[in-house]
Amino acid sequence: MIIFAFLVIILSGFIQGTTSFGFSLIALPLLGIVLSLKLVVPLLVIFSLLMNSIILYKLRSHVDLKRILILIFSSIIATPAGAYLLISIDENILKLFVGIIVVFSAIIFKLGFSIQVKNEKLAYIPVGIMSGLLNGSVSLSGPPVILFLTNQKAEKQVFRATLTSFFWILNIATVFVFSYNGLINYEVLNLSIKLFPALIIGLMFGMKLGDRIQQKTFQNATIILLFCMGTLSILGSF
């Protein structure tokens, strides 16, 4: 079990280090095969915070604080409304809807179609709102931000820095909430220590590839991960 989990964390950390997203996308369903989700989810939150802290420090010169704050503030404001959506609408319907949009967008991007938004700072408001709605309803805060940055053909380091900053702040909030509710316990911390070397191995190799990979290859990898994310969301709705 530990060997399998070790390999999963290496792979997931590698993906995260390269693209700045996709860690939970890979790790959650695979680790869920051999471990309880009560262990897996807090573990992934802790590891995500650690990874994003390291990546963010390395990419700090590419962070646009004003844009990030707009994105975060809009997301926080909309999260309670997302929770209301979860109460009002079936969760599976929301997952299906999000999955279809993400898959369709990935296909469109792959075909080379995009609509460039000139005022990006202003556009971060609706993007943040959509992210907050999805975060509060189905815990999928990433797709709106990833889709927007992909549409804008953001330079890979700007893409990674923006996404990492956004997730880093969400990670901090989530760790506090999980700790308060007793979800981060001795068992979770013990498993975190055992798997920590795997995280570092995967992350370091991923970050090296992320620095060397060509912009076009980076965009293609992002689109593939988006397609996988959307597909898993659709499958998870049934």
Residue ranges of predicted features:
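Interfacial loop-to-transmembrane junctions
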Residues: 204-225
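Hydrophobic alpha-helical transmembrane segments in multi-pass integral membrane proteins
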Residues: 85-86, 135-140, 174-175, 229-238
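Small-residue-rich hydrophobic segments that form or flank transmembrane alpha-helices
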Residues: 3-69, 142-199
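Glycine/small-residue-rich loop that forms an oxyanion/phosphate-binding "nest" at active or ligand-binding sites
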Residues: 63-110
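Small-residue-enriched transmembrane helix starts and helix-helix packing motifs
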Residues: 1-15, 119-133
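Small-residue-mediated transmembrane helix hinge/kink sites in multi-pass secondary transporters
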Residues: 83-87, 147, 207
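Transmembrane helix exit motif
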Residues: 52-61, 97-122, 207-208, 230-238
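Membrane-interface helix termini and inter-helical loops of multi-pass transporters
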Residues: 83-93, 178-191, 235-238
